UniProtKB/Swiss-Prot annotation:
This is Ras-related protein Rab-7b. The gene is RAB7B. A lipid is attached at C199, C200 (S-geranylgeranyl cysteine). NCBIfam families: small_GTP. It is a lipid-anchor. It comes from Bos taurus (Bovine). GO terms for cellular component: Golgi apparatus; late endosome; lysosome; phagocytic vesicle; phagocytic vesicle membrane; trans-Golgi network.
Amino acid sequence: MNPRKKVDLKLIIIGALGVGKTSLLHRYVHKTFYEDYQTTLGASILSKIIILEDTTLKLQIWDTGGQERFRSMVSTFYKGSDGCVLAFDVTDLESFEALETWRGDVLAKTIPMEQPYPMVVLGNKIDLEDRQVPQEVAQGWCKEKDIPYFEVSAKNDINVVQAFEMLASRALSRYRSILESYLTDSIKLSPEDQPKSRCC
């Protein structure tokens, strides 16, 4: 019986200040929710081990500060990431409109590959009534960008696990594709490179 493969993945969660990034992360990693989280300064990191597609994944998830003054510093944390959660607050239109900028920041800082960089968008706080971003609008934006969209509630534990695990699955697929491509390129010999047989 083959031992289960182990893969480390770095994921990041980004978005405007106050959209609930820390709440989402703690809901996913610790299955907890608190009303009053302190503002994240810079970045904090949480880890979670899951089993997906017969692979043990160690997810290192970076929770980044959403303040404008931290944006240049936060962008350095994008490097080497395997996937990204873009979060906004469905009761805050500005946080949704800022997704374009956050997405652009990530794509500018990650190394372009043949395989697209995995992202998911989370519309958080669907438990609240004063909604400003219609579901169809968010879905339309995501469809245009070919990014999966989830309506979530960190407070009521709605769709949080599903969203993170879809991102993990996409990040794992990309990781495998890159690894396979790298190994194929490394061992591929062109006809000119192949050793010629010689008679003694």
